[in-house]
């Protein structure tokens, strides 16, 4: 959101058939989780930016830190219970993950591949970050994809019928 130099990547990903979801505009936990209204103001801001690129506001969301984050209660106690319900009331679906590459902390490509390929659920939503400084994620991704394809997994764009991973909400 706050990095307009990457805005054109939204359209490029969309044109390649990827589902575009929203995270936040600011990714500032103190701002986003200051109140329910603050969360939706930030979400609306990223929604408007995405709409300029692809022609509509996506209905798929991932909360900063996931729905199970414990940071939000530092700013507003109980906010996650309200937000998970309210995003669905507004017609959106939020996604968490049931597998993580571990790229939220600095790791080598080999460590990311080992972590990301350690899951064996029927449906896997794997958390990887595409932000600045995640070159090891970019390097690991082909190996991760190859691993799961060799096990018979398929990769599909999310839609309303996709498997949804939800964490337990922490307030």
Label each residue range with its predicted role.
Residues 1, 25, 64-66, 99-102, ...:
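Active-site beta-loop-alpha junctions enriched in small/polar residues
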Residues 1-57, 147, 163:
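Active-site beta->alpha N-cap acidic-glycine motif
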Residues 1-6, 15-16, 105-127, 134-136, ...:
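Accessory recognition modules or surfaces
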Residues 7-11, 81-85, 142-145:
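Short amphipathic alpha-helical segments and helix-helix/interface helices
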Residues 133-171:
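C-terminal domain-boundary segment and adjacent tail
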């Amino acid at each position: 959101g706050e990095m307009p130099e990457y805005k054109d990547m939204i359209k490029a990903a969309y044109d390649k058939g990827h589902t575009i979801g929203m995270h936040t505009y600011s990714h500032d936990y103190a701002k986003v989780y200051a109140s329910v209204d603050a969360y939706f103001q930030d979400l609306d801001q990223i929604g408007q930016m995405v709409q300029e690129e692809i022609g509509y506001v996506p209905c798929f969301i991932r909360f900063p830190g996931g729905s199970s984050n414990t940071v939000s209660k530092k700013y507003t106690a109980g906010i996650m219970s309200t937000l998970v319900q309210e995003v669905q009331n507004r017609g959106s679906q939020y996604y968490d993950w049931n597998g993580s590459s571990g790229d939220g902390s600095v790791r080598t490509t080999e460590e990311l591949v080992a972590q990301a390929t350690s899951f064996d659920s029927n449906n896997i939503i794997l958390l990887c970050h595409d932000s600045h400084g995640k070159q090891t994620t970019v390097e690991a991704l082909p190996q991760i994809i190859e691993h799961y394809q060799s096990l018979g997994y398929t990769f599909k764009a999310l839609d309303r019928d996709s498997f949804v991973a939800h964490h337990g909400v922490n307030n």
